[in-house]
Amino acid sequence: LGDRWPEVDVRLEMLEEAVEVMRALWDGGLTSHHGRHYTVENARLYDLPEERPPVLVAAGGSKAVELAGRIGDGLVSLAPAEGLLERFDEAGGRGKPRYAEVNVCWAADEDEARRTAHRLWPIAGMKGQLSQELPVPSHFSQAAETVRVEDVVETVACGPDPGAHIENAKKFLDAGYDHIWFHQIGPDQEGFFGFYEREVLPRLR
């Protein structure tokens, strides 16, 4: 709420400390914590879960992936980048679940799907760590103006061809992800569900 946008190393420190506080609260009783980033005085959860909820850590870069392996109960990622899951395993993630979000844009017309993906999800075409470093929405809007349709469709399967969607999903399965969810970019959710139920999911099982 108005704080500065810290550099990535500080954000990861904050995440690790926040997870520590969350788990202490889930263990029950009064919790006090005096850390580098957070202070908690005599906090308590009165309605406790029957067991600790799993903490899935989202990560894309090497430092975040190593943190996810060390403190997380699982990994969430957006890219089948080479070596990512190996680093996760080496940091303590071996045997933990790996979730991938796969961006897709189904529409009956491929050109329409490409335009929709570019209009609604230009972040998919931003290179490197740019999207993680922009602190305010206006910066996202400015960066989005530099993204081309071709940049977005490099990572987003678009249109009605099931082969393109299957090929896109298999990149994540082949990389070692064991859970995938598909994010439909665009308004036709019913059409997307029907297409995946009939044409895509049976060929991925």
Where are these regions (language model features)?
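Active-site-adjacent structural elements that line small-molecule/cofactor binding pockets in enzymes
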Residues: 1-205
